[in-house]
Every structure is written in C-alpha cells, then in structure tokens.
C-alpha cells in the first residue's frame, strides 16, 4: 500500500512539474490497466492517448474524458512527453515511436519504478 501511494505521489509530482513548464503529456496504449491507473492518479494532465487498435480509436478511456487517437497523429500533436500505459510492451513501443511516428520527446514509464527515457 505504501509503495503504491509513493508511486501515485511521484507520478502526480512529475505531471505537475511538466504542466508548470507548459509541456504536453499524451499517453500511449489503452489497455484496461490504463483506465485503472488514470482513475487512480487523475486525468487532469492528459489530453489524449494514442493506441494502434482501430477498434479503440475515437473512443474514450472508461471513466474519463480522454479520447483515444491514432498514433499517426503524434507528428501533428508534437507532445513533449508520452506516458506509456502499456509499459509491458515498452521495447516494441519505443521502436514504433522512433521509427514509425518520428517521436522526438521523452517517454514516461510509470511501473514498476518511474523512468524517463529521452528519445530525442
């Protein structure tokens, strides 16, 4: 329980710091655990989540107002950070972000410990 609360506090602190710098954070990956984590930490710093599944695109993360978009929009949205909700697929997603979507920002991997990877 204490570790979970520490993760929540650290994630909220990080997202607040990013927000104060007027930087954009969008999510990537819309598995069920994304809904759980967002409802745990709050949605106030996330505008969109990208997911490759056309079945999810255009819909919303359950219990939130966060819309799911096609990852091809990354090049137009130009987020500063991408919060990785499908952290168990981080290697594959990092490859996609760099090679297929030309993402040149930072990636936040929240679990098991918060890591920030600079893809620039």
Functional labels for PLM-detected ranges:
Residues 1-120:
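Hydrophobic, well-ordered beta-alpha structural blocks that scaffold small-molecule cofactor pockets
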